[in-house]
């Protein structure tokens, strides 16, 4: 009997260690975890401003996704590719970066206030807001008209 409990406890420990770190449990249902942050692709068409507002309403500290490294860029690209619902509006997906802030000054930070540490621009021409382009498998940043509605990815 004692040995059976010991074996059962041992199997439980092995199962828990194989099931991961539990980081996914920190995310809301339907969100994906990556290096301490949670992400979700929304198949809703919104302007950049409306998408940012929507993200801030999802959870405390929510914003359009900020991409701080190539590793995070690859994670977001895969997440978008796997979760975007194909329509004519899926050529672009908003990210949390604007070429100019609301006061028409050049922005040097993401919508969550973090500094721009990683860049992956595809164009130099500015249309004020940035998104990921399907043609680049959602890996390159492209300038877009802020007033056009596209799908988006939130990060908390």
UniProtKB/Swiss-Prot annotation:
A Pfam family of this chain: Lectin_C
Tissues in which the protein is found: Expressed by the venom gland.
Statement: the UniProt record of this protein carries the keyword Cell wall biogenesis/degradation: no
InterPro entries: C-type_lectin-like, C-type_lectin-like/link_sf, C-type_lectin/snaclec_domain, C-type_lectin_CS, CTDL_fold
Name the record gives this protein: Snaclec A5
Described function: Interferes with one step of hemostasis (modulation of platelet aggregation, or coagulation cascade, for example).
Entry annotated with the keyword Disulfide bond: yes
Species lineage: Eukaryota, Metazoa, Chordata, Craniata, Vertebrata
Organism field: Macrovipera lebetinus (Levantine viper)
Ranges where the C-type lectin domain occurs: 34-155
Miscellaneous information on this protein: Shows greater sequence similarity to the alpha than beta subunits compared to other heterodimer snaclecs.
GO MF, any single term: toxin activity
Positions of disulphide bridges: 27-38, 55-154, 129-146
One GO CC annotation: extracellular region
Keywords: Disulfide bond, Hemostasis impairing toxin, Secreted, Signal, Toxin
PROSITE patterns found in the cross-reference section: C_TYPE_LECTIN_1, C_TYPE_LECTIN_2
Signal peptide: 1-23
Subunit structure: Heterodimer; disulfide-linked.
Family the entry assigns: Belongs to the snaclec family.
UniProt-listed SMART domains: CLECT
